[in-house]
Amino acid sequence: MTEEIDFILDSTKESMEGSIAHLEKEFLNIRAGKASPAMLGSVFVDYYGSATPLSQVAKISVPDARTITLQPFEKNMLQVIEKAIMIANIGFNPMNNGDVIIISVPPLTEERRRELAKQAKTEAEDAKIGVRNVRKDSNSDIKKLEKEGTSEDACKIAEESVQKLTDSFIRKVDELLVVKEAEIMKV
């Protein structure tokens, strides 16, 4: 195969891996019953005028499966952090005891579990669409090479390779979804 085709295949694989990485990151934000620092990943605190991730203004720890504690690096940030958690609207009610913020993670109801499973399916479908869009772009690039003089056989083999990559990454998305759904639905 030509160097151009190798480049297309490498960038295809890299882009598809990016879709999987994004899906895994999104799955971390979908809580599955037990407390985790990742649950607060979407919380940003107003730190002297700039939106700063919560993890950069407080130590986040998980003493047990139902509790998250936040120890601010600066005491004057307690109220600001508490307010940011409320604004983030992630279903937590923080309690400020003057030194730390304690968040009790409520157990998930059956209805909420179904909502989260549905959200996971939506994220997985978005990842599949991303993978398919990469395939479409790669096949289009291969067609351009064919018009520019690359052999038809080489282009056909490249398209088959792109399809194999696509199938492999779609399978990976499905596997990740099955694991996440099981994690969400486990009581």
From Swiss-Prot:
Keywords: Cytoplasm, Protein biosynthesis. GO terms for molecular function: ribosomal large subunit binding. One of its GO terms (biological process) is translational termination. GO terms for cellular component: cytoplasm. It comes from the Bacteria. Its main location: cytoplasm. HAMAP family: RRF (MF_00040). Belongs to the RRF family. This is Ribosome-recycling factor. It comes from Flavobacterium psychrophilum (strain ATCC 49511 / DSM 21280 / CIP 103535 / JIP02/86). The lineage of its organism: Bacteria, Pseudomonadati, Bacteroidota, Flavobacteriia, Flavobacteriales.
